[in-house]
């Protein structure tokens, strides 16, 4: 099936955040080690409040949202022209009666996905960037799974860009800072072709001697 990698990445980050919240006392020291910020106490208090919601979505929101927020977007995807699976016929599926099947195909893509961490100050952004990096690394195996649980993302590499201003659509929002993580990965995508043309129940009638 055609995978939606941005949705799978967002779901994986959200799952890791849920795991972090359930074991924050254990995981926070391990993830952050000695890294602290001027707003560390306020940040930890925020996470300790179960009613506070972490927004993880696909694309940038167009309205103000309470912090923190993580926005996942597909930056680029390119079919690998020398990959093994380009337009290959991976099998013939024949459901039901003979002659009613459809062909299955697969291709390999190289994708680049942006994960933006937004916050009201640099401390919040740094905190969310470290937590999101941990989330992506801890969910790496799950993202390799086939849809709908994962997105068949292989050879994942993670990098971080510098602090950046928010996009134009966020100009009036409460987020003056953003830190972008970039996830690059190979992705295997599969799909089914059209049902093959078939002829069923055809009959031919021959009248001997006609026209002689």
Spans of features found by a protein language model:
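Small/polar-rich, solvent-exposed N-terminal microdomains that initiate assembly or binding
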Residues: 1-93, 196-200, 205-212
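Acidic, Ser/Thr- and Gly-enriched intrinsically disordered low-complexity segments
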Residues: 7, 62-69, 73, 77, ...
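A generic structural micro-feature
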Residues: 64, 105-107, 171-177
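Extracytoplasmic
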Residues: 67-69, 110, 178
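A contiguous catalytic/ligand-binding core that recognizes phosphate-bearing ligands
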Residues: 91-95, 99, 116
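Short beta-strand/turn micro-motifs at beta-sheet edges
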Residues: 96-105, 170
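Glycine-rich, often proline-containing surface loops adjacent to acidic residues and nearby aromatics
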Residues: 105-119
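Acidic-leaning, charged glycine-interspersed low-complexity segments
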Residues: 123-192
């Amino acid at each position: 099936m055609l995978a939606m990698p941005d949705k799978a990445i967002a779901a994986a980050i959200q799952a890791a955040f849920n795991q972090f919240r359930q074991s924050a006392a254990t995981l926070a020291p391990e993830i952050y080690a000695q890294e602290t910020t001027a707003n560390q106490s306020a940040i930890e208090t925020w996470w300790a409040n179960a009613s506070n919601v972490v927004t993880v979505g696909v694309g940038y929101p167009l309205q103000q949202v309470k912090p923190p927020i993580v926005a996942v977007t597909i930056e680029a995807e390119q079919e690998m022209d020398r990959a093994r699976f380009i337009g290959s016929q991976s099998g013939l599926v024949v459901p039901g009666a003979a002659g009613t099947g459809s062909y299955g195909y697969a291709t390999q893509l190289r994708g680049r996905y942006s994960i933006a961490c937004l916050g009201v100050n640099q401390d919040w952004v740094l905190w969310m960037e470290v937590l999101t990096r941990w989330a992506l690394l801890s969910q790496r195996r799950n993202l390799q799974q086939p849809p709908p649980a994962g997105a068949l993302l292989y050879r994942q590499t993670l990098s971080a860009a510098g602090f950046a201003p928010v996009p134009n659509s966020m100009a009036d929002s409460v987020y003056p800072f953003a830190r972008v993580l970039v996830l690059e990965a190979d992705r295997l995508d599969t799909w089914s072709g059209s049902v093959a043309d078939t002829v069923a129940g055809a009959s031919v009638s021959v009248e001997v001697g006609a026209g002689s």
